[in-house]
UniProtKB/Swiss-Prot annotation:
InterPro entries: Allergen/soft/tryp_amyl_inhib, Allergen/tryp_amyl_inhib_CS, Bifun_inhib/LTP/seed_sf, Bifunc_inhib/LTP/seed_store. Subunit of the tetrameric inhibitor. CDD domains: AAI_SS (cd00261). One of its GO terms (cellular component) is extracellular region. Coiled coil: none annotated. Five disulfide bonds, which are essential for the inhibitor activity, are probably present. GO terms for molecular function: alpha-amylase inhibitor activity; serine-type endopeptidase inhibitor activity. Transmembrane segments: none annotated. Belongs to the protease inhibitor I6 (cereal trypsin/alpha-amylase inhibitor) family. Keywords: Alpha-amylase inhibitor, Disulfide bond, Protease inhibitor, Secreted, Serine protease inhibitor, Signal. This is Alpha-amylase/trypsin inhibitor CM16.
C-alpha cells in the first residue's frame, strides 16, 4: 500500500501535468490559421442566412448545419471563438465580415445567431473555455 505522502506527490504530479496541458492548449497562436481565411466560414454564412434571416439558400437546412458545424469542427478548439469573431467582423468594417447586410435581416440579427453556433443546441463544439460556449462575443470585449 502506498504511503500517504506518495499519494499526495502523485496527485500533485497529475495536477501539474493537467495544468501544463491546458496552458499549452490555451497558448496556441491562431494568427497563422486566421490569415488563411479568405471567405470566413462560407457554409456557416448559408446556415446563418437560413436560420436567422429565413432566407432560402441552396440545399437543405440540415445539410447547411452539418457543413457549418463541420467547418467549425475543423478549426482547432482554442481558435473557434476567435474564428467566429472574425466571421462576424467589426461593425465598423462590414466588408471584412462573413456576414452581409440583407434586406429585412440586419447584421446584428445574424451576429446574435453566430454567437450561439458552438452551443449544445447547434454544433455543440468545445472552445478555448473547454465548454460549448464563447465568452466575450460583444465587439467591445474583443481584444
Amino acid at each position: 500500500m502506498a504511503s500517504k505522502s506518495n499519494c499526495v506527490l502523485l496527485l500533485a504530479a497529475v495536477l501539474v501535468s493537467i495544468f501544463a496541458a491546458v496552458a499549452a492548449i490555451g497558448n496556441e497562436d491562431c494568427t497563422p490559421w486566421m490569415s488563411t481565411l479568405i471567405t470566413p466560414l462560407p457554409s456557416c454564412r448559408d446556415y446563418v442566412e437560413q436560420q436567422a434571416c429565413r432566407i432560402e439558400t441552396p440545399g437543405s437546412p440540415y445539410l447547411a448545419k452539418q457543413q457549418c458545424c463541420g467547418e467549425l469542427a475543423n478549426i482547432p478548439q482554442q481558435c473557434r471563438c476567435q474564428a467566429l469573431r472574425y466571421f462576424m467582423g467589426p461593425k465598423s468594417r462590414p466588408d471584412q465580415s462573413g456576414l452581409m447586410e440583407l434586406p429585412g435581416c440586419p447584421r446584428e440579427v445574424q451576429m446574435d445567431f453566430v454567437r450561439i453556433l458552438v452551443t449544445p443546441g447547434y454544433c455543440n463544439l468545445t472552445t478555448v473555455h473547454n465548454t460549448p460556449y464563447c465568452l466575450a462575443m460583444e465587439e467591445s470585449q474583443w481584444s
